[in-house]
Amino acid sequence: QLGYRGKKGDGSDDNIQLDKVNVTLLPGSRIGLLGPNGAGKSTLIKSLTGELELLNGKRVPGEHLAIGYFAQHQLESLDVSSTPFVHVQRLSPTASDQEIRNFLGGFGFKGDDAFGKVANYSGGEKARLALALVAWQKPNLLLLDEPTNHLDLEMREALTQALASFEGTVILVSHDRHLLRATVDEFWRVADHRVEPFDGDLEDYRVWLKARLEESRRDSRGEKA
């Protein structure tokens, strides 16, 4: 069971968003998560990272698992009094200055931009920095929750190309259909508290979602009649 645990002593119940989830990630899998808003896609991602405690069951990581995780809320954890250069340097104190500067240049922080205060950055610049910190750690499993929000067109295309050439495992939540088409080769559908393989493409999912919404409207009208 995946969801949010009620607080002890306040009488609140566990909020179960996903139930009886049984998934296996194989090396090289490239999976896009599809599902209505609020169905539990982000909950699944957080549970796989270990950020969200399982309500029931267990998570069994591989021996050499190295997770790279990006979600919009991580922008808030950036040290706004620091710089992109220092953020990377903290991760790898022995890395050379030139190595760090070359790496950051690939994410748009060229020259003096690598030494600008994060507090002065736009949402897009902060998103680029957060993605750079994920990439620097060389993960073999990428868990990405709406990574293109705030990114301009150039950086979206750069991210798409980087993910397409990434040799590890990818699980991606995104409304960017171009990104999904270019970087994943299978889909899981998250709906009705379940996570299941979706045998179809994005057009098939659009048809499924439209039919679901129409059925929901009919049910709603029936209740009001």
Predicted regions and their residues:
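ABC ATP-binding cassette signature C-motif
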Residues: 1-225
